[in-house]
A protein has these predicted regions:
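Bacterial Sec-dependent N-terminal signal peptides
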Residues: 1-23
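Low-complexity, acidic/polar, glycine-enriched regions of mature
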Residues: 20-199
Length: 199
């Protein structure tokens, strides 16, 4: 009987360890969700979303293998430092913010990428934008360690980057140039700086 109880206790400890996780919340005041596109085939136009939120559940403070990530951004918060352009981006020509006010991302896997470093991962998940959901992959480079801020918050962070094709999500507006080519590139580069607070 004693052996059975000991075995059961050990099994419970192993199960508890396997389901233990560290929860994080995105710190919006110290993060940035940026993007850029090629304009007129000669320069980069940059923008960002100013309102967004997200949560992360990782195995430990530093192990984000197969972390569970949920993220959303408010399309109406788009900012390219030009009100007229921002208005056009919110219109049915692009995001159609009135009909599709949110962009969301839900992770499917997060695998270590040793070629890029000890804290590098390939992040794959479902990106939903303009009413279309596609599976996409990004590179995520984590901080080398956690830190505690002056207010007692435990922090970690990631730089996440990659490229998507806006036409895959139905954002197909463009204008042809006289010399050939188009006004706005189909490729959109994403560049996120993410700071997390341990929940």
């Amino acid at each position: 009987m004693k052996k059975f109880i000991t075995t059961a206790a050990l099994s419970f400890m192993v199960m508890s360890a396997s389901i233990a996780q560290t929860n994080w919340k995105l710190d919006g005041s110290h993060s940035k969700l940026g993007f850029s596109v090629t304009h007129m085939m000669v320069s980069e136009t940059e923008g960002k979303f100013k309102v967004y939120e997200g949560t992360v559940a990782s195995k430990t403070d530093m192990d984000f293998t197969d972390a569970k990530i949920n993220f959303s951004a408010d399309v109406n918060s788009i900012n390219t430092e030009d009100e007229k352009r921002d208005g056009h981006l919110k219109s049915p020509d692009f995001f159609d913010a009135e009909k599709f006010p949110k962009i969301s991302f839900v992770s499917k896997s997060m695998k270590p990428n040793a070629k890029l470093g000890k804290t590098a991962y390939t992040l794959t998940g479902d990106l939903t934008m303009h009413g279309v959901t596609k599976t996409v992959s990004f590179t995520a480079i984590g901080a080398s360690q956690t830190v505690k801020d002056p207010y007692g918050n435990i922090k970690n962070g990631f730089k996440v980057f990659g490229t998507i094709n806006r036409k895959d999500f139905g954002l197909s507006w463009n204008a042809a140039l006289e010399a050939g080519g188009v006004a706005v590139s189909e490729a959109v580069k994403l560049d996120l700086n993410i700071e997390l607070n341990k929940a």
